[in-house]
Amino acid sequence: MFNGTFSGNLMGFLYFTLFIVSGVFISNNLFKKLSFLTRIFLGTVTGTVLLMWLPVMVSFILGFNVLSHIIAFVLLLGLDVLSVFLAKKPKLTSFNFSFSKDDLFTLIPVLIMTVFYGIVEASHIMQPSETGGMIFGQSTYADVHIHLSFITAPIKQGTVPFYYNIAPENQVSYPFLSDTVSSSIYIFGASLRWSYIIPTIMGAFNVYLGAFMFFRLWLKKFSKALIAFILFAFNGGFGFMYFFDNLRINEDNFTRIFEKLYETPTNLDGNMIRWVNTFCDMMIPQRATLFGWMMLFAILYLLYRAVFLKENDKYIYAGVLAGLTPLISTHIFLAVGIISAVWMLSRLYLMAKFKPKYAFYIALALVVLGGIIFIATCIKTGDSIMNVDYDQAGMNVLGAVGIIIALIYASLILINLFNGKFKEIFFSWGIYLIIVLALAMPQLIKFTFGQAQGEGFLEPHFNWINSKDSYFWFYVKNMGVPALLIIPALFNASKRNLSVVAPIAVLMLLAETFSLQPNVYDNNKIIYPAFFLAIGVIADYMVSVYEKLKGIKGREILATTVIIACVLSGVLSMGREYVADEYEMFSSPQVQVAAWVDENTEDDAVFLTNDRYNNAITGLTGRSVVCGGGWFFSTHGLPNHSQLQNDVRQMYADPENSKVLFEKHRVDYIVVGPDEKGSYTVNEDAIKNIADMVYNENGIQVYKLK
């Protein structure tokens, strides 16, 4: 049952731990020359990725069950042995525990943030209420149900791929490995709550450590890496100003941050504050984003060493991680693809021995061309500024600039091949690309491409989520000080740093002209990787300015003021999230009926319920319902919600004449409770004629069809 047992918790945690330890063992063998902390980072990422992938790979053949997980563990041991032989000097005991002062000062903020994450995550997931219900947090309330269903459903269905239990006819093409990593703990009898929480804490540790290690590698100076880490962990703009307005007259304007639902300095929809804090609204509620960022920073770390430090063996490891990313986070796979493509373009340009200043002129020409195309399209499609097809204008810019970049790409490849650079290209980017495509294409073909054909995916859309503010003001007030510093930071940046951050332009162009999924807000999953690159060069600039002010009185006060302005909105939002464990998503009667369902019904049973957003039967038990919440249908591109609603309504209102519908949807049980009675006309007398009551507690009845 979803409450788990002591032995189940122990087995699940042991299984998880063995994968993490094996990942560190493999990392130690493959990356002997790197620091101990780096090997820990790459090792915990490796262990997490192997826990995501090995059980699922075996489950494609044998089904999602304990046997598959045992075989996956045997394969893990095989990889451990293989890593020993791949090591340049294979010694099972060759562990270098060297720890620098910078490593220690890196771990301190990383561990503080990880512990804070664990505390908030634990308070936000399935906390028992005083009445026997389950409490969730502000940020997890909207997303957690679908994640719970993705954890429980594959175990009950016993298959991979598995199907949405809120829409049983539809295969899950969402990047589900971020959830089945918890299924691989839950399957041993662990509690659903701890199965959910444990991998996310490791994911948060990897994100924070990965971000810091990448910034240290790139920016070289610890102080710059620390500033970049702070900007990442506590991001926020000028949203705090909305809460300090008229504070003397109305104190409630400030305290509402900690009392109201989603009225924070980083998430205030009515005032167009949509640049949410990385901790509160991304890492806590969004598992695909959390584990996607884990992959992103590991790949960036390895790829940076390969591209800019010329460590060609890192192309192999970066390629493996990138190729395994689509079913962890499709958005991050796309972002990694764009970053890789732009970094490769910069390398090809330098290999062709063109002067770096010409790259600036080319970039400037593309900006001017894009502006001309945008303005020309606006003039052509509208008779006033309020009647312009901005979506089409953005698409035209994306298309034109994309074609030109592709032509430049092809030209540089041909020039380098003509100059005898084939071997150099093949044994670097060529190997990387082959590995990525070999691993990623089966995932994309089997899952991603099919889902992307659904309604609302890949459509023209200009100006992201901004519907009220002028274009630049929207980003200034949302991103705050970093938005004001990005231009001077770029002008101050070294040639190498400009190459590192060049992908920002392509990432932002795509995110600002295209809706990648039905919920355009989720384009922020492409914008955040651009932001991570931007804060690196901004941190570099901030420290440089501070050093140039040496000897000037008040520079410490100025620096402190700037940092406070950078993080105040984020800190206040995180404070709100810390106390936001107050929302009962499942009532005590709902939890009790879910417990009965989990213990007394078939794993493949289908239930007729109303289409409520948060359904304890689908979330806690993994069983299927005829029709789940409409919001999930919309954001996941699932079809026929209206038709399914009509079928459900018909079966409740006239069950005796709905035999065809009951058979069509393979209904086994009918639930009648306050939710159903509040949503439909429920003919309970007729239901009793076709089904037997098997549960009747707390105003909820469950009937089994005869």
Predicted segments with their positions:
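Membrane-embedded, hydrophobic transmembrane alpha-helices
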Residues: 1-103, 350, 359-365, 384-403
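Active-site lumenal/periplasmic loops and adjacent helix-entry segments of GT-C-fold
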Residues: 5, 113-295, 330-334, 583-584, ...
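Start-transfer (signal-anchor) and selected internal transmembrane alpha helices
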Residues: 66-130, 222, 226, 414-417
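Transmembrane alpha-helical segments
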Residues: 116-121, 234, 238, 328, ...
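Membrane-interface alpha helices of multi-pass inner-membrane proteins
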Residues: 280-282, 315-330
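Hydrophobic, aromatic-rich transmembrane alpha-helices
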Residues: 298-306, 339-351, 403-420, 478-498, ...
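Signature aromatic-anchored transmembrane alpha helix within multi-pass, membrane-resident enzymes
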Residues: 359-370, 403-409, 422-437, 544-574
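Extracytoplasmic
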Residues: 540, 546, 550-706
